[in-house]
Amino acid sequence: MRRLAWTAFLICAFCSPRPAAASGTLALHDCRLEHPLKVTSLAARCGVLQVAENPAEPLGRTIGLHVAVVPALNRRSRAAPLFLLAGGPGQAASDLYVSYAAAFARVNRTHDIVLLDQRGTGQSEPLFCDYPEDWRETHDELPALRQATLACLARYGERVRYYTSSVAALDLERVREALGYAQIDLYGASYGTRMAELYLRHHAAAVQAVVLDGVTYPEQAIGPQTPLDGERALDLILERCRYAPECAAAYPDLRREFDALRAKFGPGSACLTLPDPSTGEPLELEFDRGVLAAALRLLSYNATQASLLPALIHQASSGRPAALAAQTVMMAREIRGQLASGMQNSVVCSEDVPFFGGVDRQRLDATYQGTEQLDALAEICKLWPKGPVDTDLHAPLHSDVPTLLLSGEADPVTPPANARRLAQGLAHHRLLVLPGEGHGQLATGCMPRLVAAFLDARDAQALDAACLEEHRPAPFFVGSTGPAP
């Protein structure tokens, strides 16, 4: 479970894809897309596109890319299809869609939705490493991480180097051609915004409109800034509690309690026995700075989860950290099952860690996350093969394609400042920032309607976003029963 402290977040029947897709060369068949937690499944049309694992050796080993098309409900619509680019890195586009299908329902009225499980994820030659939940319990952390990484490489070999974003962007273009689409729209979430920017840089003529949700910008090497962004987000959450009358009344000393909690579990730890959230069986857990950091970061990801933080911090500071620990176990397990950690290693070790430059460790150590994530990444990347990366991957992006940027004010990993940085090179864009919200805005409030309207008109400035002024983040829990009535 501790490994995830640094890693890391409707049924409809269809007959056939619309004519634009039918003109392609990729054969599709009826299929169902299953929710990652097995709670539902959706109908689609699926196919497998065979591509070279190493693009420099077209006659070498091939892999199958899993592609799913959810046809537009209006079969006569000629709107461009929307390609979904998932986050992580390591999440499958099919998992993203099934989890948020309701948020895409308006778009799907007139747009095909295309789901390419990026190479190394989902059903496209997934690369999962067996990093055990308890690798930190050896108290010999980095050697245990090295051992698990070497075991993963023994399973997959040197070929993991061919699972970078630059190679995946070539796959995306091949899928577009194989489906017969002349032009497409892009929706990228979190790491998926990097993929969208990379594709847009090299295939702008094929893109009509772009939605970026939880924005990265090309010049950014993801890693060193993450603890600082997480600290900023947590400060905003605690400050929001201070100005919310019910929360402030329930937890008048929340900041002091939080500071005391950090001081206690910085150098120290507590051995807990709590009911396993999945089985109810007794679960032994060493609660220390790493578990606390994982809890705070994961709970900060969206305002609904963040609504629990004041109550959980209060309980933990009062000597009852079990509820906070249980939340961490549940969220970490869910993420662990959905992120292909080997693919994540291939991306981060090739595209981010080599570009870290100077890291102010003293500044990072002052945050609740500290430098543990960076140390773990560095250890993995000493061993992990480096793959092909475009020379302009980290160059500024300049584009005149209509682009809608979505940010949460309290996003712990991709704050609004990222979107503002990217926007400097976008000729036709609009940034929507939701107060109090965290990572990923597509399913928030009236945002599904706004995204659909943007993709139909491709004019971000003309959007009437007044509905967002009525939105409020989830109220804080002020007791075991929930928010104040």
Regions picked out by a protein language model, each given a short descriptive name:
Residues M1-T7:
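Bacterial N-terminal signal peptides that target proteins for export
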Residues T7-S16:
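Bacterial N-terminal signal peptides
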Residues R18-A21:
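Sec/Tat signal peptide C-region and signal peptidase I cleavage site
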Residues S23-V291, S346-P485:
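Gly/Pro-rich cap/lid or specificity-loop segments adjacent to the active site
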Residues T216-L234, L312-S317, P321-R333:
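Flexible "cap/lid" loop of the alpha/beta hydrolase fold
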Residues P275-A294, Y301-T304, E334-G342:
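Structural motif
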Residues S300-H314, S318, P354-V359, V389:
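Short helix-capping/linker segments at secondary-structure and domain boundaries
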Residues R320-V359:
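Long, low-complexity segments enriched in small/aliphatic residues
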